[in-house]
């Protein structure tokens, strides 16, 4: 037996997806001096489906994962978690790279943990994105030595 939702339950998520897509397009246009971005109808539908899947996948994971978690599988999940957590740091220490020397305002460990935690929170579903070696943190040109305190506090607040 199927349970049909009301019209409001079907329309509000659709409006939310369309609004989020238009906000993203506006942000891209604003960042690129209001360059013209034209979407065909099929691309807009594709973006709506993609955005809906982006919204639904964490909800489904959070709902079904604890329900299927058995105590016998807990040690396997912890091993996988710690491997994913420690592998980028092991690669970083094995490569011999170092943090830039122009991070004097705040401690280097704070910068490294802040970058790692923020990057992990954004890209936690993509293991290849977490590698600190691929970020080339030893390149001093990537990091300006000005405004470190403001950027650090802003990043910490957003995390």
Swiss-Prot record:
GO biological process, one term: single fertilization
Tree of life domain: Eukaryota
Keyword Transmembrane helix: yes
InterPro entries tied to this protein: XK-related_adapter
A Gene Ontology cellular-component term: membrane
Family: Belongs to the XK family.
Protein name: Testis-specific XK-related protein, Y-linked
Organism ancestry: Eukaryota, Metazoa, Chordata, Craniata, Vertebrata
């Amino acid at each position: 037996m199927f349970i049909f939702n009301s019209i409001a339950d079907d329309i509000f998520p659709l409006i939310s997806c369309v609004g989020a897509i238009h906000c993203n397009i506006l942000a891209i246009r604003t960042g690129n001096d209001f360059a013209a971005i034209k979407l065909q109808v099929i691309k807009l539908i594709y973006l709506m489906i993609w955005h809906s899947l982006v919204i639904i996948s964490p909800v489904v994971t959070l709902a079904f994962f604890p329900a299927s978690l058995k105590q016998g599988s807990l040690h396997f999940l912890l091993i996988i978690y710690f491997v994913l957590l420690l592998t980028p740091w092991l690669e970083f220490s094995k490569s011999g790279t170092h943090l830039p020397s122009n991070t004097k305002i705040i401690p280097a460990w704070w910068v490294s943990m802040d970058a790692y935690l923020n990057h992990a929170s954004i890209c936690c579903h993509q293991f290849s994105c977490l590698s600190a070696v691929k970020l080339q943190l030893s390149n001093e040109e990537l990091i300006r030595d000005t405004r470190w305190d403001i950027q650090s506090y802003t990043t910490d607040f957003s995390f």
